[in-house]
Design a protein with these regions (language model features):
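Surface-exposed loop/turn motifs in large extracellular/passenger domains
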Residues: 1-404
Length: 404
């Protein structure tokens, strides 16, 4: 059973490329839903612009999400046969912890894969919320090399329709990108990556961390020699605006000139981890698909689903030096903490290993209301303090991290 779509070795090659949409704008695809794109290429040599006048803009895809019925288009199927099937499967998911991957796929509970993708050219990318060099937003998405390990997660290879040996192994590369601008959730690779939501269902019964957490592996972003500039307001990062629930491995951001925002600004990630769960006694956003206030204690079974691990990842500034700035102030009488970090702006229960920042010139935040750090602006156990094990809460930044 191969329920997802497959795009294999497809390409766009132009001297000039402009993509303009109200929402879901992508250099290759506006939206990927339960879709695998393997070794696909977008190349524009002279001019390259992707713009969304609203949300979701990406150099490769506007959004990479679950199946249409379970996520993007779940509201479109309530009154037809497909909607009835999805509703039935969702009920089964909520009551059966031993559900099969095929049944999950039938409901669209299957992530999208961007494997071995290449985006090249003088890209200028813009939108409002969720703007990223590869994708504006990824719900449980995989952005990784087209190695056999990842191909075998896709049904066409898992079910032996295709042989992994017939596919060239390629890393994910974004080169030549000049500027990425937006309002909230803006990043060089993704505006936001998070654990997927499934038709409003909190899937602690599914083994959520292993099945629906995002994965980024072997990705390189290279700006021009003049440098890549990334600009926004909230959750702005050289690699990711925010990242909640997943793993980031072997990621490099090169020729980064500046990352600037109002708050939560980082050379690699603006905000990493579950966010401000403990600060308000609960989480009011739709994390993990919940549409109501989520108390910290309710995360007990899915604590690992909101934790972020980062390994062997690097931020390299331009020769003149990288600047990271959080420009917000409390001039209006507010009590907001403004944070900026050379690697992560705000780190909540995030494990970072063998990662560094080079050619860092300046990190700044407001003198009175801000926190700025060469590697991390603020680091704390955050929302996982009451749900993770004692072992998890021991100091999650290792001695192999550095700023040069």
């Amino acid at each position: 059973m191969n329920p997802e779509s497959l795009l294999l070795s497809c390409s766009i090659n132009n001297k000039g490329l402009t993509v303009l949409s109200e929402t879901y704008a992508g250099g290759f695809a506006g939206a990927l839903a339960n879709t695998s794109a393997v070794n696909c290429t977008v190349n524009s040599t002279n001019t390259f612009e992707v713009k969304s006048t609203s949300d979701y803009a990406g150099g490769f895809a506007g959004i990479a999400s679950l199946g249409w019925s379970a996520d993007l288009g779940k509201g479109d199927t309530k009154n037809n046969l497909l909607g009835g099937v999805v509703d039935l499967v969702v009920k089964l998911l909520s009551s059966n912890a031993d559900i099969s991957p095929s049944l999950l796929s039938l409901a669209g509970v299957n992530p999208s894969y961007i494997l071995g993708a290449t985006v090249s050219g003088p890209l200028n990318l813009s939108g409002v919320d969720y703007v990223g060099g590869m994708t504006g937003r990824g719900n449980g998405a995989y952005i990784a090399s087209s190695s056999a390990d990842y191909l075998n997660k896709v049904s066409y290879w898992r079910n032996k329709v295709y042989d992994t040996a017939s596919v060239s192994v390629k890393d994910v590369e974004l080169s030549g990108v000049q500027s990425i601008t937006g309002k909230n959730f803006v990043g060089g690779i993704a505006g936001s990556l998070g654990t997927a939501k499934v038709a409003g269902l909190l899937n602690d019964t599914l083994g959520l961390a292993s099945y629906l957490g995002f994965t980024v592996d072997k990705v390189t972003v290279t700006g021009p020699t003049t440098g890549l500039s990334i600009t926004g307001e909230q959750r702005i990062g050289g690699g990711f605006g925010d990242a909640i629930g997943g793993s980031i491995n072997t990621v490099t951001i090169k020729n980064l000139k500046s990352v600037t925002g109002n708050n939560r600004v980082g050379g690699m990630i603006g905000l990493a981890g579950p966010g401000d769960l403990a600060d308000t006694g609960g989480l009011t956003v739709n994390l993990l698909g919940l549409n109501h206030l989520l108390q910290v204690k309710n995360l007990l079974k899915v604590a690992s689903g909101v934790r972020v691990t980062i390994n062997d990842s690097h931020v390299i500034g331009v020769a003149d030096g990288l600047t990271v700035k959080a420009t917000g102030t409390n001039s209006d009488g507010g009590v907001v903490d403004y944070v900026a970090g050379g690697f992560v702006g705000k780190s909540h229960s995030c494990e970072i290993n063998k990662s560094d920042v080079k050619n860092l010139k300046e990190v700044s935040a407001n003198d009175t209301d801000g926190y700025a750090g060469g590697f991390i602006g603020t680091s704390q156990t955050g929302g996982l303090a009451d749900v993770a094990s004692e072992e998890d809460l021991k100091g999650w930044i290792t001695k192999d991290t550095s700023v040069l």
